[in-house]
Amino acid sequence: MKFSIKMVVAAVAVFAGGAAMAQSTFDKINSSGKVVMGVRESSAPMAYAIGSNQSFGGYHVELCERVLKEIVPKAKIEYMALTAQNTMPLVQNGTVDIGCGPTTNNLTRQKQVAFAVTTYVSQVRAAVKADSPITSIKQLDGKNIAASAGTTAVQLLRKFGKDNNVTLNTTLGKDHFESFMLLESGRAEAFVLDDNLLAGVIANSANPKGYKIVGEVLGSEPIAILFRNEDPAFKKAVDDSLVKLMKSGELAKVYDKWFMQPIPPKGQALNLPMSDTLKKLIQEPNDKPLEAYADQ
């Protein structure tokens, strides 16, 4: 399988993808000879840019690469860097064939795109500086908090503030790197995001020991690979390939590589063992949305 890299300007690509909708995903890939994989630039360990040559890696990137190698072995992979904000429209209109960032599966998004079986369950928490006295989200009442635009953390913070009668002043970064810079520079007291992504940002920072993850869990979220809606053949192929990786133990090996072992670029290990929830999902795969977890 051949590989190439493509960066995207969202405003252009959103309008360029309409023609792709008339074809099934497999037809589009077969006619073009390539498959467009949506990735992220700063979402370690799930999907992120590594090195000056802008290669991409991460847990979800590797899972996607393995799936594509099985279901479209002759296609060239073209990597397209996305953000949390433009992922939905670019997958929905067919510009991106498969989205491999850390995207939460929820009912609202299911109206726009389809999700594969869940491959990670995140917990949304807060990162603060190591010497910060903050141990609870409630202690951030009236303080500035960083969050990344387009992430579910924004809605969770709004809900938490309303439910607990606290004022959470949220400043949005365009991506996780920019949001972390708000914390790093002191312009924010905390950065709220999925625990695994917080750990990845901290591990790749200039001072990994200078930060800690604290506070109550704002929400548990199923994270999954995504693709166009109303394309059951492509969904079945992706799901079948992922389930095969789960049952063979290969998915667990990929998890260990990115969550327990040292990862690039700084060789820092996140040391995030697989949760019991994900272990159960590997035994009993499903594509249930966030709302199903809230009802449990």
Residues covered by each model-derived region:
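Extracytoplasmic small-molecule ligand-binding "clamshell" domains
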Residues: 22-99
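Periplasmic-binding protein-like
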Residues: 41, 120-128, 203-239, 261-284
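Ligand-binding cleft/hinge of the Venus flytrap
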Residues: 49-53, 65-75, 153-172, 202-207
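Extended ligand-binding regions for polar small-molecule ligands
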Residues: 61-71, 138, 143-144, 151, ...
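Acidic, polar ligand-binding/catalytic clefts
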Residues: 65, 77-139, 279-291
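Short helix-initiation/N-cap motifs at beta->coil->alpha
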Residues: 77-89, 132, 170-182, 219-221
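A ligand-binding cleft/hinge motif common to bilobed small-molecule-binding domains
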Residues: 86, 102-111, 156-161, 184-185, ...
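Ligand-binding clefts/hinges and TM-proximal coupling segments of bilobed small-molecule sensing domains
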Residues: 155-170, 243-296
